Structure formats: C-alpha cells, structure tokens
Amino acid sequence: MPYIKTINSLEVLDSRGNPTVEVEVITLSGAKGKTLVPSGASTGEHEAVELRDSDSKRYLGKGVLKAVENVATVIEPRLQNLSVLDQALIDQTLIQLDGTPNKSKLGANAILGVSLACARAAADYLGLELYEYIAGIAPKQMPVPMMNVINGGAHASNSVDFQEFMILPTGAPSFKEALRYGAEVFHHLGKILKQKGLPTTVGDEGGYAPDLNSNKEALQIILEAIQNAGYVPGKDIFLGMDVAASEFYDRETKKYLLASENNKTFSSEELVSYYEQLINKYPILSIEDGLDQNDWDGWKLLTQKLGQKVQLVGDDLFVTNTQKIQEGIDKQIANSVLIKLNQIGTLTETLEAIEMAKKASYTVVISHRSGETEDTTIADLAVAMNTGQIKTGSCSRTDRIAKYNQLLRIEKNMSNPSYLGLKVFYNLKK
C-alpha cells in the first residue's frame, strides 16, 4: 500500500558544517524515500524561510531542531495514511498546515524535506528511478552543466565581485563528454593558478577562489585554461557568470559598487554597458542576477539591450516563485529562470514554476545551493523536466560531484539520451 506510515526527521550537517534537515518517509508497503535539504549563502529576500532555532548555544544559532520537531509533531500526524502517489495533495496539505505565504511557521526546510521524501517513496513504491517517476512518459534530455570553476563574492574570501564564473561545455556530444571537458579545464585552471603563485583553495561550490585583481582577470584565466585543455572558447565551451548583483547594490544610492574596479560605483545603465563590453570581448553565454532583485527598471534595460545576445537568468529576481515569474514574463524581464527547490519549498510548486517559464519561452536552469549535501534530487529533476541546464558546482567536493555522478548513471540507463548543447539556448540569436 502506498500510504504513509511513518515520517522520520533528523538534524544533520550540510557541506558548510551547518545543520540541515533530513527526512525519511516510509509507507505501509515498506517503500522508502529519504531527502536532505540544501541551504543558500546569498538568498533572495522573497525566498521561502528556513526555520532556524536561533539558540546561540547550539551551532551558533543555526540549529534546526524546531524544523525537525515540526515534522514529527505537526506534519507526520496530518500526512499519515495519505498516498505518496498523490504529490499534489501532499504538497497542498503541507502548505495549508503552514498557513503563511513564505512557509515561516513550519519552515521551508521541514516542508521541502517531506515533499521530496514523499516523491522518492513514490518512486520506490513503483520501482522507478526518481527522474522516471517525475517525468512519466515525457522525453528526457541530459542537461548542459554550468560548472562554477572560479568562486567570488559571498561564496569566497577574495577580491572578485562576481559570485561565480562558469564554463558551459555546449560543444560536447553527450553529457559524459561535457563533464570530461569541464573536468579537464578545471585541472588546467588549477595548474595556471599554481604557476602564477596563486592558491588553489576552493570555495563553497568547489571552484577555485584565487585572490584575483578583477572580474576580467577571472574570465581571462578561464579562457587560458580552456585553450590549454585543447578546446576552443566560444565553440566547444562558453562562459557564464552569476553576478549576484544584490550583494554589492546600495539601495540608498541605487548604485552598484565594484571593489575590483577600484571601488567604482555604477548606475544600472553603466553596469549594463559594462556587461555589454564583457560579452563583446569574451564568449559569455549566460549572466545570472546581473542587477539587484528589486531593480526592475534596470532589468528591463538589461533585457532590452542584451536579451537576444545572452541568457539573462533570474535567481534572486524570481526565487522560484510563480507570482514573481509571471510578473517578469508580463514585464518582459530576463529570459531565463533559475530553479532552486528550497526557494519555494515543495515539489509541486517547483514543477509549476518550471512549466510557467517554459510556456513563456524562458529557458530553465536547475540549481544547487552553496550549502549542499550528498542528496542528488536536482540531478533527477533536471532530466525529468527537460530543463537542459544544471548548476551544481565545480569538479571538486563530493557534495557537488554526487550530482554529476548521478547524471552519469542516468545517462547510462537511458535508452536514447539526448544532449542538445547550444540548442538549449533557443531564445538567443546564436
């Protein structure tokens, strides 16, 4: 029987040593599903709320015992005897139990853990892989990995303003080969940094975090690594950036401060021009969060200027929220949506956000968080929903590699996997 018997929850640690929630759902038939919930460092102000204990005597106030208790005392009694095959009902029940617009009562970390664990239990009950269960009969394609090879901003302790510098191996014939391209570039990048006397320590997402002088220097070094690995920039491999502009935006002056540009301040218009210069000089295919999450006028200008040349991804801008995404679609803001499960808090709402973006011809990127675990749900989700792109870090740290290895297994198991490469960016004039 696919009905929920028990829901177990546990306070465990994420990749940054901070507490997070693990949830296991067990059905009357014995089918099981277990999920660990990720956590972000730079978060959008409209995200669903992680419930933390704020007890300074435990984990510097970051404990999640309240969320764990909510699973046991509030959620489990209400979900017992519901079918794990009815994901929509489960998620609707979770949302109603919480009763707040941002899931702050029970905690998005508790709610998401239960939602995803139920989906895994359903897949186990049916004898399916998670991606097969979510996808149904939909065609399945492997995603282009957006590999974060240099970390800056809130993800590293260096002087680089932008949070992530990524490589996109669009010229590879398969995901397996794309991963190889990326790994080889990553290792060549490490060699270059050593030759320059720079440290090869890594940031939260596994990319190197060298103390470079500017954002342009980061792009230049990555280009050198691509070439040293034997690949052609702008053909085999493109570049991407997660600017995370909200992190260096001053809301009082409405200016952007770039420390690596001699502490120069930029207006929205000037920052858009700065990006335009970068994409004219470097083979940049994607820019994420290029402006502050509340700078909608700036986003409008950015989209008008660069929206047909480069993928403009909204993360903090949209926070996987259908209301925010619809507002962006109506105002013709950005052309791509980043999807983070814990920004919204249930699988059903996540799938609705993906479908909304696709119907508006926005591209979709499935993403990890900077605080990750060994959980591989996002790998299955990227394939199941044919998003075509995934952000899950660099080629180091097991919490990142776990997702890549899961994608390799999925590709091997699929009868006729497709890897579209550059065709994924269907809304650009490339």
UniProtKB/Swiss-Prot annotation:
Q: What does the UniProt cofactor note say? A: Binds a second Mg(2+) ion via substrate during catalysis.
One GO MF term attached to the UniProt entry: phosphopyruvate hydratase activity
Q: Name one GO cellular component term.
A: cell surface
Q: Which residues form a coiled coil?
A: none
EC code: 4.2.1.11
State the InterPro entries in the record.
Enolase (IPR000941), Enolase-like_C_sf (IPR036849), Enolase-like_N (IPR029017), Enolase_C (IPR020810), Enolase_CS (IPR020809), Enolase_N (IPR020811)
Catalysed reaction equations from the record: (2R)-2-phosphoglycerate = phosphoenolpyruvate + H2O
Where (2R)-2-phosphoglycerate is bound, by residue?
Answer: 163, 340, 369-370, 391
Give the record's pathway. Carbohydrate degradation; glycolysis; pyruvate from D-glyceraldehyde 3-phosphate: step 4/5
Role this protein plays: Catalyzes the reversible conversion of 2-phosphoglycerate (2-PG) into phosphoenolpyruvate (PEP). It is essential for the degradation of carbohydrates via glycolysis.
Similarity remark: Belongs to the enolase family.
Query: What is the protein's given name?
Result: Enolase
Species the sequence originates in: Phytoplasma australiense
Q: What taxonomic classification does the UniProt entry list for its organism?
A: Bacteria, Bacillati, Mycoplasmatota, Mollicutes, Acholeplasmatales
